[in-house]
Amino acid sequence: MYIDKFKNKGYIFLEDPKTWPKDWISLIEKNRELIINYLDEDAAILEECNKLKESGRESENKYDVENSFSKKIGRFTKTFKALILSTNQQILCYHATRLMDYEVELIKQNGLKKCSLELRKEKIDNLLEYNIINKYEYEILSNKENNPLVLRPKRLNNTDLIWGYNTFDINDYEDCAYFLNDYGGEMIDQASFSNELKVKLQKASKPYIIICIDKISLFAVKSNKSENEYFENIIKPYINNDEIKFLNFQLKNIDSLPIHDVVKYDLWNE
């Protein structure tokens, strides 16, 4: 794998606990029992709620209350966040996407930027300028108000990046390979447009892995739920599976993420 050459170079890979600083692991392990109790109680509450709902006795739900371990988990995740922010190591993030040739240089020069309607329009304009689509197809892609199939600047549920989607561990062949094989453009939903249009966009682009680099502070999102994100995206998967092979997390509140490399990556012809 291409990313193997970065192993043991002092980088942190969030999907690979073997690269995490020892104090991260130590803090998580010290609180393992608390975390497991929290997860178990959460699962029990959800199961009971579902049973009441299925039996038509939803009004009897006495579990619409906070998990009794929530406050302790909150204190733990705040401590974990502080530990992350004190970490000086850098992390590498991978973004699986399809790019046209001109976009590769743009990304290298400008970094991975947040999506905006202006940037989205610019990309659709370029498709027309490069004769990849015709005027009719241009209208289909551009007419967001009248065509509900045109997506907002969003793909694969919850991303807000112009060139990258949710961060994939590129070892996750089932999801990543499917994505790189089937999706032809950043703004195209697989089921939304004609096969002809999708094929055009697919042929115009090539699969790439964008390797981004930044300080861990990119996780310091200004949100009341920020501590929960650490728990849901890092700690919970670790507790559930020590051998994490796929960890999905979101990059938020960034203006531009520096690029370490943009690599043409063909999962079928490595």
Residue ranges, per PLM feature:
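Conserved NAD+-utilizing ADP-ribose enzyme module
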Residues: M1-E66, S70-K71, L83-L85, Q89-Q90, ...
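N-terminal onset of structured domains
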Residues: K72-K78
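N-terminal, charge-rich interaction modules
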Residues: T77, C93-T97
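Sparse, context-dependent recognition of short Cys/His-centered cofactor- or disulfide-binding micro-motifs
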Residues: K78-T79, N147-L149, N195
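Glycine-rich loop/turn
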Residues: Y102-W163, D172-C176
